Amino acid sequence: MHPSLYITGAGVSAESGIPTFRGQDGFWTIGSANYTPQQMATRAMYMQRPAEFLLWYYRRFAQYRHLQPNRVHRWLADKKLITQNIDGLDGKAGNVDYIPIHGRLDKVTVLHDQGAEVELLDAPWQQVADNQDAPNDDGHLKTALLDAFRISSTTQTPQMNQSLKPFVLLFDEYYTELYRMSVAQNWLLSATKMVFIGTSFSVGITDIALQCALQNNAPVHIVDPDPVDLGVDGIHYHRMTAAEFIASQ
């Protein structure tokens, strides 16, 4: 059996300055229409409107790539950890074998059929930054992004096995081995205790994890200032921030 397994969400990285992008702050405007993160973060949006998708991804995530881990990341550095966050801060904090189950901001892949074996490549964010004539001009930024991601600015159609796609699990995609899903399932099934920190239980991995814990009678702890009531008996709720929780341990 593995020791305690920690499963983290956006609440852990908030102290580092990364917004959670839920609620009003998460809306994105294209023309006169507002889109939610659930509408923007889709494979369909990437395929149909790659310039808008990449601009959204850059503004909402890539521009925070230089931020540093906080005390919670450092506390988790020697823990068995699955994170929903793509910011890579757990790796920066020194956790050498954590699972970024939704991908990593600093990596991309070639566009491929889901489930195919592909190599992780370094994300071309610096190339994008270097090629911006006017950093605050969305038009120039879109051109730089399309070029860096190998997408024709004329056709604006991503090409299979040629164009690049951010290494991120989108809402209309599913978990594959690219995201180390088999290893994650092994950890979930063999955990003696699960501690969820800063997650709203709004994505698939948290539901899978909770079911594994209940199946194995593993204690479940939820750390959140305003936790979601899961309606399950026996769950230990810690109504506090992640920083307050680690200070109490």
Q: Where do the language-model regions lie?
A:
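Conserved catalytic core of sirtuin-type NAD+-dependent deacylases
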Residues: 1-249
